[in-house]
Amino acid sequence: MQALSERLDALLAGATLRKADLLGFSSLKTYAPAPDDLRGHRLEHVTRRAKYLVWDFDDSNRIVLHLSQAGRLDIEEPPKKTKPRGAVARFVFGQGDAGLDGPGIGLLVREYGTQRKASWWVLGPGDEGPLVGLGPEPGTDEFANLIRTSDSKRQLTTDLRDQHVVSGIGRGWGDDILQRAHLSPFASLRSLTPEQREALITAANDVMAEALDLERKRKGGLSESSLGGRFKVHGKVGEPCPECGTKLERVSFESYEMAYCPSCQTSGKKLADRRLSRLLK
């Protein structure tokens, strides 16, 4: 998401918002300010906080966008007027001094799959909206201090997915981080030794830094939906562990699955697959 925000900033910073079309009614989570209130204002910069894209305008209003798991951004030059399947919103910007004139450039937010979870907010000055209460991110002193001192009893996979505990990781990178740290996803922060806590800090920092470096090198559009090739463990069930070669296993939940290496993470033990256990009852 950091690399995406950097590409958007390079593309659109300084451009004027011509219009913001709501294409998926339930995706907009605020009613005031209205999207039209930003029309004619200049986009100053695009940044990121956790899994959210933050667009700051010259009137101190902002748009916050969350693509969720299956969202993507498509550049349209010139902007289109169609409403493709899964369309969430379309933003049209005027470039340079053209301002509100000329065809400009369109940015289509589109969601693939059956679930509709992509969301956006229009926030007034001082309103943090969904950014309130987000946890620290890997690579920061706050993150390292949290890992070193937390006595959380929750499973590591749960804490790493909870954006209000640790932000910017999520389930995909969480699988890769726990394998790199040689930690069971069902262990808790409270149960870790000081050495294991340091291993988790190092793994999180390294995995996220490597992911950002790779994404910055990627060419093409602005899609964030095709991250399968970025992960080394997540989504690779049945394939060999990138470190030891052991077949990666899964634990299935209602709406997602978690991948892990039995040799690297659980001393050879296979964790109970929740979905399979229910079927066998």
Where are these regions (language model features)?
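Short clusters of hydrophobic/aromatic residues that line enzyme substrate/ligand-binding pockets
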Residues: 38, 131-134, 231, 276
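Basic, nucleic-acid-binding surfaces and adjacent catalytic neighborhoods in DNA/RNA-processing proteins
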Residues: 17-33, 47, 146-281
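Gly/Gly-Pro- and Ser/Thr-rich, intrinsically disordered tail segments characteristic of DNA damage-repair
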Residues: 1-116, 278-281
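Phosphate/anion-contacting hairpin/loop surfaces
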Residues: 63-183, 188, 200
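Glutamate identity and glutamate-enriched acidic tracts
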Residues: 6, 44, 56-59, 69, ...
